[in-house]
Amino acid sequence: MSMGNKNKWWKNAVVYQIYPKSFQDSDGDGIGDIPGIISRLDYLKKLGIDAIWLSPVYRSPQDDNGYDISDYQDIEPMFGTMEDMEQLFAEAKKRGIRIMMDLVLNHTSDEHRWFLEAKKSKDNPYHDYYVWRDGEEGIYPNDMNSAFGGPAWEWAVSYTHLRA
């Protein structure tokens, strides 16, 4: 396949961002979900969109509105199931709508298995995936603040959590 304009579709595409939690609730629980998104695909197509930028729907404790991912290979139950996700892909494709997943790679949840393993030992293979500093309980390594307020450090030995 050549690297022609076909591979650069995004340069002129209309991309519609969907924050699933508040987009469309399909089951009356007050939380938007994947079936709700599917129910609006015809409307989105009429708007003339080319792609959906889907904010995180991965499993998460929701401390950072889904950006604190605890499992990149599973869907957050409040949004639906993996089968719902597969249906969304299939239905969007039928309508010529692309799906772009918001993939958060610069941090994980403190409930992610890598972090849980990393906390066990400085020798753990996952330990270097995170920022750690030696310290004493109650004394922070520096004055860096979290995006959510307060110190970016939490005693565990000490790890930085700039987000949640």
Question: Can you say where each PLM-predicted feature lies in the sequence?
Answer:
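Acidic/aromatic-lined carbohydrate-recognition and catalytic surfaces
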Residues: 2-163
